Amino acid sequence: MSSRRKPSEKRRGRRPQRFERPRGLVVTEGTVTEVQYLQMLQQELPRDAASLKLIGEGADPLRVVKRALRERKDGDYSWTVCLVDCDNHETLQDALRLATKENIRVLVSNPCFELWLLWHLEDWRRHSSSRDIQARLAKLKVLQDKSLTSSFPIGRYADTRARSGKA
């Protein structure tokens, strides 16, 4: 007579299969605001969204792309993105060429990343300096120095995408 297990006993000891989230590498020109924003966004997104490694390089665009290349060699990433500001960087074109050659996406904020933050709050379409945008964010009490405040409306990222498409 064979020993038969109950269906519930058969399942015991089996581990459910783990879903592997895609891993992304994001290297930013900024060391505070961009990294903080992406951390907040990652918490807002569904748990099965990508797992991000965030690095604030704090350098010109070419150094940001080169850092992404170094980091990418050490990890198994599904994709790599660099965030840089347009500013007046002499290295921007070289960074874009290298990134294209190495299959790295570069998102260039014009004039600065803080414009993306402002779009969480209002439809801002006029040409402005980085200083003007940062001053507006401070007046709205969502940016203090370079740090986002707890009142920053991270949940409005869908509105932000729509506003950026109109600008």
Task: Walk through the language-model features, giving the residues of each.
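Acidic, metal-coordinating helix/loop segments flanking the phosphotransfer/catalytic sites
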Residues: 66-74
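C-terminal accessory helical subdomains adjacent to catalytic cores in phosphodiester-
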Residues: 2-4, 9-23, 35, 39-55, ...
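Short phosphate-binding loop-to-helix
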Residues: 59-67
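Short hydrophobic beta-strand that contains or immediately precedes a catalytic carboxylate
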Residues: 26-29
